[in-house]
Amino acid sequence: MTITLDGASLTLADIDAVARGGAKVAITGDADVLARVHGSRDVIARAVERGEEIYGVTTLFGGMADVHVTRDQLIDVQKIALWQHKSTTGPRLPDADVRAAMLLRANSLMRGASGVRIALIERLVAFLNAGASPQVYQRGSIGASGDLVPLTYIGASILGLSPEFLVDLDGETLDCHTVLAKLGFTPMDPDPKEGLALNNGTGACTGVAANVMARALDAATMALGVHALFAQALLATDQSFDPYIHAQKPHPGQVWSAARMAELLTGGRTIRSEAGGDRARRKGDLIQDRYGIRCLPQFFGPIVDGLSTAARQIETEANTANDNPLINPATGETFHTGNFLAQYTAIAMDSTRYLIGLMCKHIDSQIALMITPAFSNGLTPALVGNMDTGVNVGLKSLHIGMNQMSTQISYLGQSVADRFPTHAEMYNQNINSQAMNAANLARDQMDVTEHFLAAALLTGVQAVEVRSRVETGSCDARDILSPATVPLYEAARVAAAGRPDKARTIVWDDMDGFLQPKVEGLLADIGSRGNVHAALQALRSSLDTFRA
């Protein structure tokens, strides 16, 4: 698979394919696109020859933009644009995020508004295709004048600014000069504007955000699948998902969520088909399901709408020219701009984190019903498998751990974009997006969320197996589940502890084995996009095409 860069058509799926899937990258052969790239570079060259004043070319930067740069200093000032930002340390940015950042910077430069040589873009592409990842740090960017610090470590590495910039390649950590030589390049000086064009953009925070969105959409898909398992374990009615209800309140996400849940539950033996005329109630319980099921479309719908909006914003940002100044090669104009302000990325990440917190809290509240006999419609206390011993406690500790994770996930959902310092960079960056903080927190939240969902899937498997045993005498839940949820059940069951067993639930006697390896098996499958992901692929594809 090869992703072609033209500055305008990169999708979240493309970014995911390169960042996490290792897909190859190519520069478009479109003559118009290439003409814009070459043309913008020619505009800068002519402006320098004429002695025009251009920010960051013939001046210093930011709050020192009143300082003029002489002709013999033009190259040095571009080196300084990068050199001065090798200024951080701390935790490294994961390779997938570095790859996304390189891809987005290359794509942005392909718009032909940045005034750089095509050779710089070719180097970014060469690094990507070779699997060479500059060592970049999480800290240092406020997402205002772009991601100056993290993008510096990428830009300086592809230029070979100094051997102190390190690159990971084929399991080794090498200096950038060695890596350049391995790839057939030599160090090169930046031309006027090029140093600034490499680090003055939103590629780092938006690259992190793009990877987050892929995981967040996966998580939302899993969450809906988990709810479908829970609904069948709790003897839910399908009436809550009847299209008539949601036609009366036609928010796109609500309508989508109801339709998908209806599809997931169709044919389930424990689902009361009230929409089909079955009005019988179970064991004299409430005439209607509790809110967690009955209001699922109304609760989950805004999450779907919000994630769709965030995904669209990140995808748009990935196809922008976002450095300063920008050049119009058709007219020769240069524009002093603010496209480097990553506010859309910051807001999208703040929103995503908040929505993921709501999503996990909903799941946590449903599990509380399933483990509590007063609310579970006949499930065993704490979903104990073997009640005969009298000492098994089932999933009590697992749910306590999920309580902890749900709280952490919710805490990480607090906004960041509104907490910017007004004094940044000599008061020049007196508004700033904090997009890198927002995106890094979102990645951290997704780490916890995937762990939470692994535990939720284990709970769902145990719940439907307990229900199956109550209803049929067999612990193999395929006997009761809807056709649409059988693949998810099988995938989760195998990832956690092997094939379904008619005689024993996945957690039978507490001392048969620990819960930890079961959760780890599910988490590994989720992280590798294994069988659980494959089982939900149709649902994930539906979410990909959904538009709020």
Curated annotation (Swiss-Prot):
MF terms from GO for this chain are: ammonia-lyase activity
Q: Which CDD domains match?
A: PAL-HAL (cd00332)
- Where along this sequence does the record place binding of (E)-cinnamate? 200, 288, 294, 324, 396, 425, 428
- Give the matching InterPro entries: Aromatic_Lyase (IPR001106), Fumarase/histidase_N (IPR024083), L-Aspartase-like (IPR008948)
Q: How does activity depend on pH?
A: Optimum pH is 9.5 for the ammonia elimination reaction from 3,4-dimethoxy-L-phenylalanine. Optimum pH is 9.0 for the ammonia addition reaction to 3,4-dimethoxy-(E)-cinnamate.
Its subunit composition reads: Homotetramer.
Give temperature effects on activity: Is thermostable, showing a high melting temperature of 82 degrees Celsius.
Name used for this protein in its record: Aromatic ammonia-lyase
- Which top EC class applies here? lyase
Species of origin:
Loktanella atrilutea
Q: Which PANTHER family match?
A: HISTIDINE AMMONIA-LYASE (PTHR10362)
Q: What is its EC number?
A: 4.3.1.-
Q: Name one GO biological process term.
A: phenylpropanoid metabolic process
Keywords, A to Z?
Lyase, Phenylalanine catabolism, Phenylpropanoid metabolism
Concerning its family, UniProt says:
Belongs to the PAL/histidase family.
Output the PTM entry. Contains an active site 4-methylidene-imidazol-5-one (MIO), which is formed autocatalytically by cyclization and dehydration of residues Ala-Ser-Gly.
**What the protein does?**
Aromatic ammonia-lyase (AAL) that shows reduced activity to catalyze the non-oxidative ammonia elimination from the canonical AAL substrates L-Phe and L-Tyr, contrasted by its pronounced efficiency towards substrates with electron-donor aromatic substituents such as 3,4-dimethoxy-L-phenylalanine. Is also able to catalyze the reverse reaction in vitro, i.e. the ammonia addition reaction to cinnamate derivatives, producing enantiopure phenylalanine derivatives. Shows no activity with L-His.
A Pfam family cross-referenced in the UniProt record is Lyase_aromatic
Chemical reaction(s) catalysed: L-phenylalanine = (E)-cinnamate + NH4(+); L-tyrosine = (E)-4-coumarate + NH4(+); 3,4-dimethoxy-L-phenylalanine = 3,4-dimethoxy-(E)-cinnamate + NH4(+)
Query: What gene does this protein come from?
Result: pal
Lyase found in the keyword field: yes
Cross-link position, 5-imidazolinone (Ala-Gly)? 144-146
Residues where 2,3-didehydroalanine (Ser) is found:
145
